[in-house]
Amino acid sequence: MKSMLNKISKPIELNLEEFDKCFNESLDSEVKTINTIVKYLVRKKGKRLRPRLSLLSAKICGDINLKTYKVASLLEILHVATLVHDDVVDDSDLRRGWPSVGRIWKNKLSILVGDYLFSKALTNMADIDSMDSVKILANLASRLSQGEILQIEKALSKNINEEVYFKMISDKTASLFSASCKLGAITATKDPTKIEALSQFGEFLGQAYQIKDDLFDIVGNIGNTGKPSGYDLKKNMLTLPLIYILDKKTNLERKIFKFNLKMMLRKNNFNKIKN
C-alpha cells in the first residue's frame, strides 16, 4: 500500500513537505507536558491519508495555497485528537504497535491533550476565515461523535445489521475522508459540482478503508495493523465480515457461533477463528 500511496501522491510530493512544517507549527504549546505528549503522538508520520486527500483535491481543482495547508493541518490534528479519545473510550493499550497515550500518561491527561488538539484544529479553522468551512467542520464533529456513540450502543446491544453498520462507519470514519476532500477543494475552487464530487469520493473511500480495516482485524497481524488480531472482536465490535457470517445462520446457530467465538477469544486461540 505504501508504494501505491507514494505513486498517487507524486504530484504533491513537495507540498507534503510544506504541510509537515505547517502541521508541526500548529501544535506548539507553552506547557511542557503537552509538548512531550504531542511529540510522542506525532513521532511517526504515519500515512497522512487525510492531508494527502486535501492537497490532492486542491490540486485537482486549482492551486494549493496557504489555506490548503491550514485545512490539511487542522484535519490531521483533528484525526490525531480522535485517536487519543478513541483509545480512552476503547481502553486501548496499543496504538500503531506502540503504547497508547493512556497507557503511559493515564486517561485524564489523554482526554485533556485530545481537547487541546481539538482547540488547535479550531485555531487553524479561524485562520481560514470561511463560513462554509466552519459549517463543514461542525458537521464533521457531529458525525464523528454520533458514529462513536452508535458503535458503543450497538456493541452493548449486539444488535446490528448491514444498514446500521454503514451508517456507523460513514459517520465515524468516512466523514473525515469526505471532509478532507471537500475542504481541500474549497480552498482552490468555488465550483459546487467539483466540490460535491470530491466530497462523495472521500465518503466512499472512507467506507472502503474501514471495511479493509475490519478484514485486517481477522486476517491481519500486529505487524501490519498496529494492533493484535481479533482486537475489535474482543471489544464486542460487530464488523462487516461477522455480520455476513451471522446473517447466514439460524437463531440457534448464531447463539452457538457467538458462544464458540467468545470461548476462543477468551483463550486467545485466534487461529481457529481465522480458519
Listing of model-derived features with the role each one plays in the protein:
Residues 1-10:
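Charged, compositionally biased N-terminal leader segments and the immediate start
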Residues 13, 17-18, 22-254:
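Mg2+-dependent prenyl diphosphate-binding active-site environment of isoprenoid biosynthetic enzymes
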Residues 256-275:
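Mobile late-domain/C-terminal helix-loop "cap" segments
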Residues 4, 191, 263-267:
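Alpha-helix capping and helix-coil boundary motifs
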